[in-house]
């Protein structure tokens, strides 16, 4: 006879060697640091010279290159916004240690562009952005091309990588004149769940707004069936400039200028090309949004776009400030960088999408079932009853025996409890009601009648339990625990094929299904030319 209880309470380069040694020598590992500050250089491009292949540095500035390029005597070309471009012989890098490479911030040399700069100095920030939007069709490919790159998604929990999933993908894009989500195809070369890092099955589930178990607070993020790469693609506002992308950029060609205020900042350069730096922001009663655009002096091509949105209704703890000197908590941050190809067109170099999310962890301590135990009288008949609660863990002894922690009702009327005790060697508590003989008889008759008519005993009894702890004192009864995570999805291009054809066979990724669950995988003959830039553990 089981009934449920009814309550939830709820460039200068310097090579140094670190002390870390790796036994695996299939990759040369490096880390990029700012020579002045010692801070990691994030999302720098590391290319193998004349091979059009490379990687992008990780959040900690780390990267890895297959040792075969060292055997071939190749050079690495390192470039990053605002730093001097540098070439490094791979033969000078250690295969055993993390190679620390320090880069010096670049100095913008306007000697060759001074005339152009003087002519364009009077351009307002808003006018520069307007020209950049108008020139998208001219600056980006309109015909089919593909990129091959390293994709990963993961979460950060207290600064540590969790649920790291990695893949090598080829993305067949039919050009900026076509709708990306409807026409782009993706072929998976390889994918894996990296079990060298912590796995958290709850955090790895798709977003769940129906049960509110995993959500972006005060925002909505379509789960796309759990396909994180599909989520990433739709958040490239430049590629999707004619459709909605994310608040408050929305549809870039019609809404970016309308929704934001703009200002010019100090110009910079990348690979010798002078770039305007345009800052913009959105003011809203509940949100703050900040963005930066890096736009070419010459053809107004967008080289890079950064966008960060904060929820000003949720404050950072301990009076901390976010990187824009506000107190709002991060909702999402997106960074997209395009690079100019030899043909003059701009192709994706990388895209990174970070969002915070809330995960509600189910209670670890709960009541599994409630039963009624019939008690014999000295004469052998039924002389009484007791209520029995079975827990999934041993409850705290003192709290379990405190009758004040239980509120029992029979047919809506409170039933006083005389004694609460523990059943020996079981995770069970019994409750003895304090009743008159008349009340006992009436309730027993009600129980027998319900059994006879197969009536659910929930219609007779309800039990509310205060949030007692388990025996270890770590888990409160039926308490859902809120956990805050940062989710990342990132795609780093290793090779661009500026002119290609869509393969005839249909072995493409299902965009509405998780990448890492039974997707078709195709490995080309040159598969070994590509690799996963796994973060340092």
Task: Annotate each language-model stretch with its function.
Residues 19-27, 104:
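Beta-strand-rich domain onsets/edges
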Residues 24, 31-41:
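Structural motif
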Residues 28-34, 61-63, 101:
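A short, amphipathic beta-strand motif
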Residues 38-42, 64-73:
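Short Pro-Gly-centered beta-turn/loop motif in secreted/extracellular proteins
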Residues 48-50, 75-88:
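A short, solvent-exposed loop/turn motif at the edges and junctions
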Residues 87, 94-260, 269-271, 322-537:
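Surface-exposed, low-complexity/disordered segments
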Residues 135, 239-296, 301-308:
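Extended beta-strand-rich segments in extracellular/periplasmic secretory proteins, especially
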């Amino acid at each position: 006879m089981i009934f449920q209880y009814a309550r939830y309470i709820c460039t200068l380069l310097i090579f140094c060697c670190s002390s870390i040694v790796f036994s695996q020598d299939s990759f040369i590992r490096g880390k990029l640091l700012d020579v002045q500050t010692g801070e990691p250089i994030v999302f720098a491009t590391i290319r193998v010279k004349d091979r059009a292949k490379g990687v992008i540095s990780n959040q900690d500035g780390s990267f890895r290159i297959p040792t075969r390029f060292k055997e071939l005597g190749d050079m690495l070309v390192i470039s990053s916004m605002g730093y001097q471009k540098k070439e490094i012989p791979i033969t000078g890098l250690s295969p055993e240690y993390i190679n620390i490479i320090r880069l010096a911030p670049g100095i913008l040399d306007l000697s060759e562009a001074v005339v152009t700069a003087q002519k364009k100095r009077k351009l307002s920030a808003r006018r520069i952005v307007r020209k950049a939007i108008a020139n998208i069709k001219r600056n980006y490919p309109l015909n089919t091309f593909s990129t091959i790159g390293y994709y990963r998604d993961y979460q950060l929990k207290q600064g540590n990588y969790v649920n790291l999933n990695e893949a090598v993908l080829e993305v067949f894009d039919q050009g900026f004149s076509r709708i990306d989500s409807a026409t782009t195809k993706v072929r998976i070369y390889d994918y894996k769940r990296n079990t060298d890092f912590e796995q958290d099955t709850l955090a790895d589930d798709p977003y769940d707004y129906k049960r509110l178990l995993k959500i972006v607070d005060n925002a909505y993020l379509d789960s796309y069936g759990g396909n994180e790469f599909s989520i990433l693609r739709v958040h490239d506002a430049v590629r999707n400039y004619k459709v909605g992308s994310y608040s408050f950029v929305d549809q870039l060609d019609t809404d970016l200028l309308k929704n934001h205020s703009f200002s010019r900042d100090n110009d910079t350069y990348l690979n010798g090309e002078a770039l305007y730096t345009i800052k913009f922001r959105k003011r809203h009663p509940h949100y703050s949004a900040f963005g930066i655009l890096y736009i070419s002096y010459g053809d107004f091509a967008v080289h890079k776009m950064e966008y960060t949105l904060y929820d000003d209704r949720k404050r950072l703890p301990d009076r901390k400030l976010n990187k824009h000197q506000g107190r709002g908590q991060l909702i999402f941050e997106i960074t997209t960088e395009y690079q100019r190809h030899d043909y003059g067109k701009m192709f994706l170099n990388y895209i990174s999408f970070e969002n915070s999310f809330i995960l509600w962890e189910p209670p670890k301590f709960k009541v599994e079932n409630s039963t009624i135990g019939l008690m014999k009288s000295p004469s052998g008949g039924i002389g009484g009853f007791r209520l029995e609660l079975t827990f999934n863990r041993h409850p705290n002894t003192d709290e379990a025996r405190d009758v004040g922690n239980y509120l029992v009702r029979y047919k809506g009327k409170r039933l006083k409890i005389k004694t609460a005790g523990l059943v020996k060697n079981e995770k069970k508590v019994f409750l003895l009601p304090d009743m008159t003989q008349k009340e006992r008889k009436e309730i027993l008759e009600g129980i027998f009648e319900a059994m006879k008519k197969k009536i659910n005993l929930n219609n007779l009894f309800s039990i509310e339990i205060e949030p007692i702890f388990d025996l270890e004192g770590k888990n409160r009864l039926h308490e859902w625990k809120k956990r805050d995570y940062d989710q990342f999805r990132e795609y780093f291009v290793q090779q661009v094929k500026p002119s290609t054809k869509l393969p005839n066979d249909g072995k493409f990724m299902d965009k509405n299904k998780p990448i890492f669950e039974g997707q078709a995988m195709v490995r080309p003959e040159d598969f070994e030319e590509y690799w996963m830039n796994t973060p340092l553990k």
